[in-house]
Amino acid sequence: MIRAALVLICFAGAAMASEDIPDKYPQSVLYNKPVEVIPHVFTAIGATAPPTYENAGHNNNLSFIVTGDGVIVVNSGASYRLAEALHAEIRAVTDQPVRIVVNENGQGHAMLGNNYWIGQGVPVLGHVDAAAEFEKSAGQSLASLQNYARENAEGTVPMGPTETFTDRHVIEMGGVTVEVLYLGPAHSPGDTQVWIPEWSMMIAGDIAFHERMLPLFDNTCTSCWIETWDTAFAPLNPTWIIPGHGHPTSLAQVTRYTRDYLLDLREKIAVHLDEGGDLTGAYYVDQSRWSHLDTFDELATRNAGMVFAEMEFE
């Protein structure tokens, strides 16, 4: 535990914004080399930036758990090549085979690498809602990947998970109990968390953001996200959190940059609505408190418009 605490202290001290760093691991298609967060749990930290040619779409966290009888991977990555590169890093750490891949949601950067793992004979698990979302959006996600990643998109063929779950799927492997959870509505349909109670480690997926501004989608319910956080996610009280985006950190930090941001934006939009404000004015509500976050310039006004549309008829 002392080692893990030191790791997180190092992350906190070195967690400079990576939005302006095109690539931290140029010898690999991965943006970052995987690091061991606590013993047996590794993550390759993605760029806190939009997907680009330089980061090859590795802008989320790709994690893996090494047990005594195999490896559990969380996220297949945004492409065949990213999945292949992560597998090479896993092989450098352990001789244990990959037994299962868990997709954290139905977005391209979680599922577009599935065909690599399926080709390796590895089962891929995803939430039923995430699988349905990917089925609808896979073509657009692939086209986007091909546009920005160019040759790094080669080999990628959209494939959904081979197995689905609804609320909870327990993996017993090598003396470790891993709970794959759907705690409730959050960032996108089927957002999934991977919880290791014995180690108090949460691989949170996109329910939790750190260091970058979270994006809101047309199907994001911010009030639901806050409720899921307060009633299901926070009560688990994990010591260690690997968020969907950003460096591993604490519950307090992801609460600040996820739940507290959502509450603050909803409060600002509520005041704007009470004063008779319209959509155009909503784009200019004061979000300066969050201006230090990566992707603020790309997302702040868009998020304000999304919350206005959500709250206008609440």
What is the predicted function of each stretch?
Residues 88-163, 167-170, 189:
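Active-site HxH/HxHxD metal-binding segment of metal-dependent hydrolases
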Residues 38-89, 194-196, 200-205:
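Conserved beta-strand hairpin/beta-sheet module of binuclear metal-dependent hydrolase folds
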